[in-house]
């Protein structure tokens, strides 16, 4: 079995690779886990992980430059697929960041947090949303195995996804209002938070993906 981590020059790639390989050991899987920017090699993989970090316009431009956008679209149709952070945002129709069109797997937009966010006590909240936050699982999913409700994951983002179809929302967090932070449809699962930075909970989720 082969698991490809898409390398288009945008993202915490080596940290993701290290975490997924650790998760593979925990899963007891005999799987080859590798970084690749080769569309053909990505297309031959059994599972695909799509990380991303940085500005969405730059990420989309890099994806198209390397000819990986079509490989991603093909993988979305029929392979277990895990999008992380901007890799998750790229799966939506459109982003307010740079007025950028996404890949359109999920209907909806990626929106920016308001500039004057305040908590219930009236204290101003910083944007980007950065640090640990609890995640509510709103539906059952195989990737939640052995992950308790309200587990904390690590976030770094100024934009969040707003799905058109509420049935695609698998998890939510609050900053300070609820926002979708996990979405899924068929063979595709995607998180706004960074699994590779989320310690044991992130490793468990990646292990569950490799077993999915």
Swiss-Prot record:
Catalyses which reaction(s): 5-[(5-phospho-1-deoxy-D-ribulos-1-ylimino)methylamino]-1-(5-phospho-beta-D-ribosyl)imidazole-4-carboxamide + L-glutamine = D-erythro-1-(imidazol-4-yl)glycerol 3-phosphate + 5-amino-1-(5-phospho-beta-D-ribosyl)imidazole-4-carboxamide + L-glutamate + H(+); L-glutamine + H2O = L-glutamate + NH4(+)
Pathway entry: Amino-acid biosynthesis; L-histidine biosynthesis; L-histidine from 5-phospho-alpha-D-ribose 1-diphosphate: step 5/9
TM ranges: none
GO MF, any single term: lyase activity
Keyword list, A-Z: Amino-acid biosynthesis, Cytoplasm, Glutamine amidotransferase, Histidine biosynthesis, Hydrolase, Lyase
InterPro entries associated with the record: Class_I_gatase-like (IPR029062), GATASE (IPR017926), Imidazole-glycPsynth_HisH (IPR010139)
The keyword Hydrolase is annotated on this UniProt entry: yes
Residues at the catalytic site: 85, 194, 196
Subcellular location: Cytoplasm
An annotated GO cellular component: cytoplasm
Its EC number(s): 4.3.2.10, 3.5.1.2
PROSITE patterns: GATASE_TYPE_1
Subunit structure: Heterodimer of HisH and HisF.
Function: IGPS catalyzes the conversion of PRFAR and glutamine to IGP, AICAR and glutamate. The HisH subunit catalyzes the hydrolysis of glutamine to glutamate and ammonia as part of the synthesis of IGP and AICAR. The resulting ammonia molecule is channeled to the active site of HisF.
Alphabetical list of PANTHER family matching this protein: IMIDAZOLE GLYCEROL PHOSPHATE SYNTHASE SUBUNIT HISH, IMIDAZOLE GLYCEROL PHOSPHATE SYNTHASE SUBUNIT HISH 1
UniProt protein name: Imidazole glycerol phosphate synthase subunit HisH
Biological classification of the source: Bacteria, Pseudomonadati, Pseudomonadota, Betaproteobacteria, Neisseriales
Gene that specifies this protein: hisH
